[in-house]
Amino acid sequence: SICRLLLALGIGDVILVDRNGILAPGEEWMNPAQKEMAEITNKERLHGDLKTAMKGRDIFVGVSAPNIVTAEMVSTMADDAIVFAMANPTPEIMPDEAKKGGAKVVATGRSDFPNQINNVLVFPGVFRGAFDVRASDINEEMKIAASKAIAALISDEELSADNIIPKAFDKRVGPAVAKAVAEASKRAGVARIWVK
């Protein structure tokens, strides 16, 4: 789901990794869903482990297991790398270690660090917007609209390496996401009623 959204947003290449290694065509251990994703990702057809996958990359998005990334691995990424280490309660790498490795922006799923990425920012507004127009589906266009609505709540003046996303209980988020999702559902043709 994260990968499909990143691709829909126009991210040039995504490399997926699970405990067995990088998803790449021809890997015998992959299940059918992984085989499908391997066909649309990993343009360089890399094989190997997480360490290999991170070399030279701009962004790491982790939603897997605690303490699987090291500062050394982050140091092999592109300059000013972005690290979203969202395993809970212990992220793939702690923020101070990621920054020690050279990460410019670090986010986790935890409220005790800057840039908490929490699904509470998304779900209430997505469902409110979809319910308001009786959407028949929640599609990629609606998800993209939600992500852009959340991002727009941080002004250029507020934006910094430690402030890339609104706080979990920011009262502006739900209504902004709901409005964006409702509008996107209309554009996508899945709204069954029109609400002003």
What is the predicted function of each stretch?
Residues A85-V195:
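Adenosine-phosphate binding glycine-rich loop
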